[in-house]
């Protein structure tokens, strides 16, 4: 761990306040959020050591190619956003995430109808059967992610998910050279309720999808019980580029593992 402190440093942007951590050999000439100048602040603090890291698989050339394809689909995008000078500023950055693994027992009650209609002679008949349906399941959710940086828009980060958590690695300084890395500033106590909300939705989706063969399904009640939950801090790879024009900020973000834009 002392090695980690010796080889990394923190830079603070005086314009937007973003705090970026990178290898000391990396030249920090602009903030990847606002492109303002950055200055050396302090060293990587031990309490911010991540447990896991998702290494970059997409290189800068591929990121630029995908950006150019993406930019052609966006109306009224300033031409300067895709200029050569701007393309050079596309940045690989490790974004802090909290990953939650949880075992959940989910329950769902529903009132379902099966409606049959037929015609006999001059009459049309309808038969409605009503069923009270109950579902219960024990489910495991592994490494459900959520952005741990207040500088990043949650919607932007969620739009480039998912990551393949099978490729998570134990954190090592060896993954940092050539990339920026931001420290988290949203503690797990802030983010955990948001992740639990995702897990509740996922549980209910699974239970709801198990109810089929009915004309109508009305959910009467749901319940989710978290039996066991663990949380770990990880760095996830993102290619980013921002551009400011007047009072508007344009953001391009791409999953550095899968290439999803």
Task: Locate each region found by the language model.
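Extended, hydrophilic extramembrane loops/domains of integral membrane proteins
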Residues: 236-261
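Charged, low-complexity helical/coil segments in non-catalytic cytosolic or luminal regions
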Residues: 23, 48-244
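Short, flexible, mixed-charge glycine/proline-rich loop motifs
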Residues: 1-8, 19-26
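A generic beta-sheet turn/junction motif
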Residues: 15, 24-26, 245-247
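Short cysteine/histidine-rich zinc-coordinating motifs and their immediately flanking basic loops
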Residues: 24-30, 43-49
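Short Cys/His-rich micro-motifs in 6-15 aa windows
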Residues: 35-42
């Amino acid at each position: 761990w002392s090695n980690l402190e010796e080889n990394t440093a923190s830079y603070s942007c005086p314009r937007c306040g973003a705090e970026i951590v990178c290898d000391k050999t990396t030249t920090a000439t602009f903030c990847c959020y606002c492109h303002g100048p950055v200055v050396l602040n302090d060293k990587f603090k031990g309490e911010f050591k991540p447990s896991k890291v998702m290494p970059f698989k997409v290189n800068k050339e591929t990121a630029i190619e995908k950006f150019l394809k993406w930019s052609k689909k966006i109306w009224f995008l300033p031409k300067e956003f895709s200029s050569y000078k701007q393309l050079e500023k596309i940045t690989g950055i490790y974004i802090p995430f909290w990953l939650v693994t949880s075992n959940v027992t989910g329950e769902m009650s529903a009132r379902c109808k099966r409606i049959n209609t037929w015609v006999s002679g001059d009459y049309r008949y309808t038969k409605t059967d009503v069923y009270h349906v109950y579902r219960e399941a024990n489910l495991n959710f592994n490494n459900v992610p959520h952005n741990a940086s207040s500088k990043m828009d949650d919607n932007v980060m969620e739009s480039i998910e998912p990551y393949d958590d099978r490729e998570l690695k134990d954190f090592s300084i060896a993954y940092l050279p050539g990339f920026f890395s931001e420290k988290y500033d949203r503690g797990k106590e802030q983010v955990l309720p948001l992740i639990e909300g995702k897990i509740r939705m996922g549980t209910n989706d699974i239970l709801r999808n198990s109810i089929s063969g009915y004309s109508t399904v009305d959910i009467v009640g749901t319940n989710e019980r978290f039996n066991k939950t663990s949380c770990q801090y990880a760095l996830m790879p993102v290619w980013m580029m921002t551009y400011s024009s007047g009072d508007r900020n344009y953001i391009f973000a791409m999953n550095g593992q899968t290439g999803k834009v």
